[in-house]
């Protein structure tokens, strides 16, 4: 089995390399050069397919569709110059913190909404 960090590094390198590739010859380059809505719609499509695979309790499809979803999320992150390591660091920061506690800390750090006049 390939280590998850190694495959993430290789995929990230491939996506970065495709930033300068010809969109006519590379699916990744095509998505990177398109408007962001196209990438976001693809993520929504893959998320919906993942949800349907879960509802069908189809293990193989869940794995397949989740891989598609993660792949397209990596492309979206590359568009914003965010590395997978930034996401992994955030997950590591949250590790061991209860979901309730983490959510509460987010709400306490939000500015108070202003009243519309």
Swiss-Prot record:
One example GO MF annotation: phosphoribosyl-ATP diphosphatase activity
Reaction catalysis annotation: 1-(5-phospho-beta-D-ribosyl)-ATP + H2O = 1-(5-phospho-beta-D-ribosyl)-5'-AMP + diphosphate + H(+)
Pathway(s) it belongs to: Amino-acid biosynthesis; L-histidine biosynthesis; L-histidine from 5-phospho-alpha-D-ribose 1-diphosphate: step 2/9
GO process annotations (BP): L-histidine biosynthetic process
Gene3D superfamilies: MazG-like
Keywords assigned: Amino-acid biosynthesis, ATP-binding, Cytoplasm, Histidine biosynthesis, Hydrolase, Nucleotide-binding
Biased composition (Polar residues): 106-117
Main localization (coarse): cytoplasm
EC number: 3.6.1.31
Subcellular location: Cytoplasm
Residue stretches of biased makeup (Basic and acidic residues): 96-105
Positions of the UniProt region annotated as Disordered: 96-117
Top enzyme class: hydrolase
Record's GO cellular component terms: cytoplasm
Similarity comment: family membership: Belongs to the PRA-PH family.
Name of this chain's protein: Phosphoribosyl-ATP pyrophosphatase
Organism: Nitrosomonas eutropha (strain DSM 101675 / C91 / Nm57)
Gene: hisE
